[in-house]
Amino acid sequence: KGVFELNPGECAMYRHSKLRRKKYYTVEAKEHTDNEVTTIEKTRYLLTDAIQRQLVSDVPLCFFLSGGLDSSIIVKTASMYNKEHKLGKINTYSVEYRDNKKYFQKSNFQPTPDYEFISMMSKNADTKHREIVLDNTLVCDALYESVQARDLPGYVDVDSSLLLFCKEI
């Protein structure tokens, strides 16, 4: 009772025994007027800038590589940055489930296994890659701990897999 989650773009201040919620940001939909070339240039600039700003670190960084579009763009951009600044290869990690390669069945949602794209991207970005293999029983056993770690309902096996994956790294 009395516990809530803030909405996106909202902050809260507790002062003088009162809680005040305030909206500080709202996304506005606007008409897109740029042509294809300009759109590509702006998108590339914004993505590269956002990723490179996160690469400044006193310790070596590592990256989750799922083989999907998001992680692949991040890994390739980070790899190019490290190469340009002579910082060496980046470390990438992926998660796999024991016997998934053996029992994989394609679907409309997932027509091919992730490991094919992970391997392709790791080679393309020239990373030091490590695959973490999780046992399905351990993923199930970690469900309760993952709910506690998130402190709110989440994505069931995805959360427990992520918890075990991070522990392994």
Predicted features, each with a name:
Residues 1-34:
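N-terminal segments that mediate ammonia production and transfer
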Residues 28-169:
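ATP-dependent adenylate-handling active sites, centered on carboxylate activation for C-N bond formation
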